[in-house]
Amino acid sequence: MAKAKFERIKPHVNVGTIGHVDHGKTTLTAAISAVLSKTYGGEVKNFAQIDNAPEERERGITINTSHIEYDTPIRHYAHVDCPGHADYVKNMITGAAQMDGAILVVAATDGPMPQTREHILLSRQVGVPFIIVFMNKCDMVDDEELLELVEMEVRELLSEYDFPGDDLPVIQGSALKALEGQPEWEAKILELAEALDTYIPEPARDIDKPFLLPIEDVFSISGRGTVVTGRVERGIVRVSDEVEIVGVRPTTKTTCTGVEMFRKLLDEGRAGENCGVLLRGTKRDDVERGQVLAKPGSINPHTTFESEVYVLSKEEGGRHTPFFKGYRPQFFFRTTDVTGTIELPEGVEMVMPGDNIKMVVTLIYPIAMDDGLRFAIREGGRTVGAGVVAKIIA
């Protein structure tokens, strides 16, 4: 009898390169692809293929991003690389490419530069949890002390933004020399891959997180009660589970008495599935679109938060003119628009289309949120910006 083919599904981790322009992010991406495919198998992407990043649209925002994949013995990685600084800003704020960890590329010949700092700050704001440093172009620096100095500088900069600068891995290498096949530098790429494997923990799968379903629609079924529908964002809901209805109004508790999908009754609804959840003793008017159904105690409603925002340029269909403090647009969270006011950082009078900016937002009513929640800014149904909740205030 033929044996069934054994396929081990490796854990999947999302990473990306960040850092200052011309410090070697794309060359490093190509070097990782080349060295790992040579060592562990897989498809090679060369520099030109990665550099020619296709245009993508995420929430109406044009972003150029290159996606490559590679394997280590224990994991499968999806890696994003962006050609331009603006692409990084947009990518990180919209969450188009969410990263479980980032590889910060710093040229040893230059040390940290303005965009190095900006990418670290962005990583902190949008919740990139882990950073590994690759000091590039080390073949061009003969002085050991200089390399040590640059490493110290990078570690201090990371600590300044609350990353564990003293403890995180720093690998000194040369992406170009590794790409040219020089064994001593190829070894540095393998060292980087090992750091990815050991330093970035395996991310929790959506299905293992606490249950959350953004409510899209509410129906009442005579004799059975109220059904809310939507796509389960994370976790699992089972019949007879206690759930909370969070956001917009005071939080209430109820019980799931049924789950249905495509008119069939199920025992549970899981992350990624569109389903209807029947709620015990809940009236049709007690629930509305914009609220979420969640595991009790797992998420709270908030109105005020600090955010990192990218304002669409005129070419992207955004505003043609700047906006000022006191601007009152709609903030679109998950399934609904909420009006809010903004507070700009000290010394900032106006925000131009194409800018990215830190702002404090106060909504007119509370929405269920955690740090890292993405939102769109809209005016009359047109998207004019994208943002992420960096820190909840109230």
Curated annotation (Swiss-Prot):
Residues that hold GTP according to the record: 19-26, 81-85, 136-139
InterPro entries listed in its UniProt record: EF-Tu_GTP-bd, EF-Tu_GTPase, EFTu-like_2, EFTU_2, G_TR_CS, P-loop_NTPase, Small_GTP-bd, T_Tr_GTP-bd_dom
Catalytically driven reaction(s): GTP + H2O = GDP + phosphate + H(+)
GO cellular component, one term: cytosol
Gene Ontology MF term list: GTP binding; GTPase activity; guanosine tetraphosphate binding; translation elongation factor activity
Residue ranges constituting the tr-type G domain according to the UniProt record: 10-204
A Pfam family that the UniProt record links to this protein: GTP_EFTU_D3
Region (G3): 81-84
Chief localisation class: cytoplasm
Ranges for region G4: 136-139
PROSITE patterns assigned to the protein according to its UniProt record, in alphabetical order: G_TR_1 (PS00301), G_TR_2 (PS51722)
Location of this chain's protein in the cell: Cytoplasm
The protein's role, per its UniProt record: GTP hydrolase that promotes the GTP-dependent binding of aminoacyl-tRNA to the A-site of ribosomes during protein biosynthesis.
Family, per entry: Belongs to the TRAFAC class translation factor GTPase superfamily. Classic translation factor GTPase family. EF-Tu/EF-1A subfamily.
Cross-referenced PANTHER family: ELONGATION FACTOR TU, MITOCHONDRIAL, ELONGATION FACTOR TU-RELATED
Protein's name in the database: Elongation factor Tu 2
Native species: Shewanella frigidimarina (strain NCIMB 400)
Organism placement in taxonomy: Bacteria, Pseudomonadati, Pseudomonadota, Gammaproteobacteria, Alteromonadales
